[in-house]
UniProtKB/Swiss-Prot annotation:
Keyword annotations from UniProtKB, A to Z: Hydrolase
Biological role stated in the UniProt entry: Dienlactone hydrolase; part of the Fusarium detoxification of benzoxazolinone cluster 2 (FDB2) involved in the degradation of benzoxazolinones produced by the host plant. Maize, wheat, and rye produce the 2 benzoxazinone phytoanticipins 2,4-dihy-droxy-7-methoxy-1,4-benzoxazin-3-one (DIMBOA) and 2,4-dihydroxy-1,4-benzoxazin-3-one (DIBOA) that, due to their inherent instability once released, spontaneously degrade to the more stable corresponding benzoxazolinones, 6-methoxy-2-benzoxazolinone (MBOA) and 2-benzoxazolinone (BOA), respectively.
Record family assignment: Belongs to the dienelactone hydrolase family.
Pathway involvement of the protein, from the record: Xenobiotic degradation
Protein name stated in the entry: Dienlactone hydrolase 2
SUPFAM superfamilies, sorted: alpha/beta-Hydrolases
Length: 234
């Protein structure tokens, strides 16, 4: 039986670039967990809530800018600090080349702890923001955060994957098996695969590379289109 098809976080989760820009959201606490809140303009709000599960760098500028962009598309976007103040960026801004950063130790500390924090946070978010019958929830996860989408998403809800063609954490055989399982169980899904980009491209692409920048932006647009379509259908 296939319990988990994607492999645990590895050194590839530390690759990529930091982006620049001005974050427009704010940070609050939900059940004692730091949460970045990006609010849509009232004229653009669709009344839906998007839960954002960040990569190993946690609540950092790349995540802030993406959450702000989702808010621009109408979604009240909430990002969780499931590392509880201890993301990779607390230890190093250059973790791949920093001899003082022990990734394996950091990973082992947070694999289970981040799951517990995420589950607690999601429960609190639903209690705080889901009191109205009109509120609908969607979720998006990058790198470290992708598994939380699978854990928190309803078994019957549509799911969208955007992945690189070469990824040691989600190899072609695993992608194919994922498609087989979803198809066998008559689940609604879509998967887009990008060549010549690395793990984490959707959140940490090199924006100086036109193709990587396009792949990142195409992924964002696909996510928004997917949310808009399925949230409208409910």
């Amino acid at each position: 039986m296939d319990n988990v098809l994607a492999r645990p976080a590895d050194i590839c989760c530390l690759k990529g670039s930091f982006h620049s820009g001005d974050a427009t959201g704010s940070t609050i606490q939900i059940d004692g967990i730091d949460t970045y809140v990006a609010k849509p303009h009232p004229d653009k709000s669709n009344g839906n809530v998007l839960l954002f599960f960040p990569d190993a760098f946690g609540l950092h500028i790349n995540s802030f800018l993406m959450m702000d962009a989702f808010a621009e598309c109408g979604y009240l976007t909430l990002g969780v600090d499931y590392f509880l103040g201890d993301p990779v960026t607390k230890h190093s801004l250059t973790p791949l080349s920093d001899p003082n950063f022990d990734f394996e130790s950091w990973k082992n500390k947070h694999l289970k702890a981040s799951e517990d924090a995420a589950a607690r946070w999601v429960k609190a978010v639903k209690a705080q923001y889901g009191s109205s019958e009109d509120v609908r929830f969607a979720c998006v996860g990058y790198c470290w955060g992708a598994r939380f989408v699978c854990q928190q998403l309803s078994a019957d809800a549509p799911i969208f994957f955007s992945v690189p063609s070469t990824d040691k954490l989600f190899e072609p055989e695993q992608r194919s098996r994922t498609i087989e399982i979803l198809t066998e169980n008559n689940k609604q899904f879509n998967m887009q695969v990008f060549a010549n980009v690395g793990h984490g491209f959707a959140s940490r692409a090199r924006l100086t590379d036109p193709y990587e920048k396009w792949a990142k932006e195409a992924t964002f647009k696909s996510f928004v289109d997917w949310f808009d379509f399925w949230m409208e259908k409910k």
